[in-house]
Amino acid sequence: YFNELAPGYHIVAAGSYMGLALRRENESFPVGKIDQLTMRPMGFVEFVRAVDGNPLADAILAADMDLLANVSEKLERLLKEYLVVGGMPEVVSAFAASHDFIEARRLQQQIIEAYESDFGKHAPARIVERMRLVWKSLPGQLAKENKKFVYGALRPGARARDFEESLQWLMDYGIVHKVPRVSALRAPLTSYEDLSGFKLFCIDTGILGALSGLSPAIVLNGPAVFTEFKGSLTEQYVAQELLLQGKTPAYWSSSSGNAETDFAIDHAGTVLPLEVKAAENLKAKSLRIACEKFKLERCVRTSLAAYRDEGTLVNIPLWEIGQIDKLA
């Protein structure tokens, strides 16, 4: 109607279930008439702006590494807070006003309950229980040393074909994101996707923490959060930041199993492999193997260590990984 009879009006609409709505039979969609934007949870810099103000957030966006090096302890503290609170707007708003981690967890649990109650409202009844199994398995899947999604962990004898539809519904629902394995670190990465392997990440670090029952105290007190659960919360955070920057992350592992990159992204006409390290651990054996094997000129390690450009290898602090395009 508006396009044909009232083209002078510009309409903005928001919805939570666009991916599900388009799955319905006989559902029409005005191709070429709509610009779509994907809203994701708030990233780390948006969280900093909400709870600490504009100056520090602006410095993060500007990738002012000299200035940021002087406040690295504060940034690490804020990063831990973000891992607990996450980026769901209601939770961030409440936390910015109260700095109450218990209240943040309560709101996250409400969001989880709303997600789970909606499974039965939109998805076919025959797959609802399988959707719940996949959803509830996320903390355990990401806590493994090898974070490749394993269908057999869902229930004894589970096979991919039994759960593929339920997994696709969760992806369309927008609360999980699949990061595929690639057989080679060559551009474009989509040409080398290996359909047999993938990692599955949650929509948000805070939601993942609440889903796993992780105590905020474990995250906030000391460096344990970066090593607990095999660094799953840290890797979840990096996945979120990459997605927020419009990246389509993948990961690579060698056929022999002796090397793996946590992520890889298409970058400036080539591929940029990325390794997520716990705390200030700077060993990057797998990353070096990957760079040598595929003759890559640049690779990224992200950790709590300071920014360091060593030519082929650049270390980007975890709290600055959202600015990877400026620093890599």
Q: Positions of the model-derived regions?
A:
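Active-site beta-strand-loop-beta-strand hairpin of nuclease catalytic cores
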Residues: I265-P273
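Conserved Walker B catalytic segment
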Residues: Y1-V12
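Accessory nucleic acid-recognition modules appended to NTPase machines
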Residues: M88, V92-D266
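Short glycine-/polar-rich loops that comprise or flank the Walker A/P-loop
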Residues: P7-Y9, V31-D35, K247, K295-R298
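Catalytic cores of nucleic-acid endonucleases
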Residues: A278-W319
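Short beta->alpha connector loops
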Residues: Y17-L20, V182, S255-G257, A278-L282
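Hydrophobic/aromatic beta-strand patches that form the interior of the parallel beta-sheet core
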Residues: V12, D35-L37, F201, A250, ...
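Interdomain motor-coupling "hinge/lid" segment immediately C-terminal to the ATP-binding subdomain
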Residues: G8, S16, A21-A143
